[in-house]
Amino acid sequence: MTTKNTSGRGQRELRVRVKTAKGRKLSSTLWLERQLNDPYVIRAKKEGYRGRAAYKILELDDKFGFLKPGGRVVDLGCAPGGWCQVAVERVNALGQRKNKPEGTVLGVDLQEVEPISGAEIHQLDFLSDDADEKVKGWLGGRADVVMSDMAAAASGHKGTDHLRIIALCEAAAAFAFDVLEEGGTFVAKVLAGGAENELQALLKKNFTKVANVKPPASRADSSEKFVVAMGFRGRASEPEEGEA
């Protein structure tokens, strides 16, 4: 936060400090203070994004270029909507670039998400039995990109949280295998912890390129990273009748 120095000595950066309110834990106070001083949080407010996470997908797309005008994107775990906002811009879902094809963006989340211009948002438990079919019905065809920023509620136990998010990634990957166009891209947030190795192996079988990235917008003290799998090889053909 930039504030004018009334002493006339020019401008200086002032760090916002939060007093520990009665009943508020010190950890909560420190988190709030970090949020208020986070340059990505400040930038998101200025640029109209719903959260700092928008810059993670921006930075990943700047590096790999998977969000293209005319693209069809599915965003799993889309709340509060930052990734959808970026996707709408990059795939030209609002048709603002008249000489470029218009894309589509479909967002899904367990919690209600405020409407986003240019995106179709649905409230849904993606782990429910009929979730895949519902999303495919809303999509109405194949997708070029499936993105997952899904995360389970934190348990406070690092190992448990790691396994939960890997399970969500695996569910998202299975869905991606079912809906992606050949050559499509899968992007997902994971937490480092060891169990992601099987997911990596699965993705390498189904995509021509798999990269693990920690974008600058991801906090240095966070165990999160992102897997970007590009060049979907396509669904295996069904065996002929009589084949083993």
Curated annotation (Swiss-Prot):
Binding of S-adenosyl-L-methionine, residues: 81, 83, 109, 125, 149
Keywords: Cytoplasm, Methyltransferase, rRNA processing, S-adenosyl-L-methionine, Transferase
One Pfam family cited in the UniProt record for this chain: FtsJ
UniProt cross-references to SUPFAM superfamilies, sorted A to Z: S-adenosyl-L-methionine-dependent methyltransferases
Chemical reaction(s) catalysed: uridine(2552) in 23S rRNA + S-adenosyl-L-methionine = 2'-O-methyluridine(2552) in 23S rRNA + S-adenosyl-L-homocysteine + H(+)
UniProt family annotation: Belongs to the class I-like SAM-binding methyltransferase superfamily. RNA methyltransferase RlmE family.
Protein name as catalogued: Ribosomal RNA large subunit methyltransferase E
